[in-house]
A protein has these predicted regions:
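Catalytic alpha/beta core domains of metabolic enzymes, predominantly
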Residues: 127, 139-247
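Catalytic cores of TIM-barrel enzymes
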Residues: 2-4, 184, 259
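A general structural signal for well-ordered alpha-helical segments in protein cores
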Residues: 27, 59, 63, 88, ...
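Structured C-terminal cap/extension of enzyme domains
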Residues: 195-309
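Active-site beta->alpha loop and helix N-cap motifs at the rims of alpha/beta catalytic domains
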Residues: 2-10, 15-143
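Short, amphipathic alpha-helical "lid/cap" segments that border enzyme active or binding sites
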Residues: 24, 28-31, 148, 281-288
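Short secondary-structure transition/capping segments
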Residues: 54-57, 90, 115-118, 146-148, ...
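Alpha-helical structural signal in soluble globular domains
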Residues: 37, 61, 65-70, 94, ...
Length: 309
């Protein structure tokens, strides 16, 4: 499949039942809703997908279910996150054989690699597969920062094609463009920096809280890339109160609860995560319900959307 590297690629949750078993039917239904809302691709097994709680065979089942649900309409991107490079290479090959359209690759977990080690990890995994790869940079969560200078060195690796930029510093997008030009597709990776990222030239958005608000998420991006900023601002101000849920250590529980309250899935998570209780639950529900009850009328994007790069 030729991947349209642009616009909204939701980072899907992995749906579970109360007993923590996989609910692949619910996962498939949620994927269907995201495609219907206009998603250009779907990302499986990321942080929101609770990758670390899944056994290898479960990961394969989740991606296989996503491929079946997408049915060739949008690309399925499988996330590769392992503690060692050898395991990451093997999983990348597994996903290619399974039929994933692309990969999103994280640095190796637990050990905090230095820049040379990090770049070798990305080079080695990229050599193990023909699939195109999104490089995920999230130093706040994973304690390894892939800097613009490092991406300039990695630019010679042909199947490292995109960057999910989640440093939380929107200046990084400009620094990346200055360092590597248009060599990589740039995805916004932080929900409450989506509009700012679009204005600074991000090509797409790997979205989180939009799982509960898919139409609003898509329209916000459409307005942003069409530079309809005046129309986008009221929607973004409403959306940002919800998007802040994506920046907390419990973002998985928060977003899954929002998905449940929106009628698009269930909040069940896998231990050590637990569903929210008591005052925290009441506080987050208040934010979610305020968003649901205050949904604005969606403005139309008047200008044509920019063509794909």
């Amino acid at each position: 499949m030729t991947i349209p590297w642009r616009d909204v690629f939701p980072a899907m949750t992995t749906q579970f039942r109360r007993d923590e078993s996989l609910d692949l039917d619910a996962t498939g239904r949620h994927i269907e809703r995201m495609i219907a809302s206009g998603a250009s691709g779907i990302v499986m097994l990321g942080s929101l997908g609770e990758n670390a709680t899944l056994a290898p065979e479960e990961k394969r089942r989740v991606v296989a279910a996503a491929i079946e649900a997408a049915a060739g309409r949008v690309p399925v991107i499988a996330t590769v996150v392992e503690t060692g490079t050898a395991a990451a290479k093997q999983f990348a090959r597994d996903m290619e054989r399974l039929g994933a359209d692309g990969l999103m690759l994280l640095p190796a977990m637990i050990y905090r690699a230095d820049p040379r080690e990090t770049m070798l990890h990305y080079r080695d995994v990229a050599r193990a597969t023909q699939l195109p790869i999104i490089c995920y940079n999230n130093p706040l969560a994973y304690h390894v920062d892939i800097t613009p200078a490092m991406f300039a060195e990695l630019a010679e690796v042909p199947n490292l094609v995109a960057i999910k930029e989640s440093s939380g510093d929107v200046r990084r997008l400009t620094d990346l463009r200055n360092a590597v030009g248009d060599r990589y597709v740039l995805f916004a990776g932080v929900d409450d920096l989506a509009l700012e990222s679009a204005v600074l030239g991000a090509d797409g958005w790997i979205a989180g809280i939009g799982l509960a608000f898919p139409e609003e998420n898509q329209r916000l991006w459409d307005l942003a890339v069409a530079r309809e900023i005046e129309a986008a601002l009221p929607l973004y101000r409403w959306f940002t109160l919800l998007a802040h849920l994506d920046t907390h250590v419990k973002f998985v529980q928060y977003i899954k609860l929002a998905v449940q309250e929106a009628g698009l899935g269930a909040e069940w998570v896998r231990a050590p995560r637990r569903v929210l209780v008591h005052e925290e639950r009441r506080r987050i529900l208040k934010v979610i319900h305020a968003g649901l009850e205050g949904r604005p009328k969606l403005p139309k994007a008047r200008k044509p959307r920019p063509r794909a790069r």
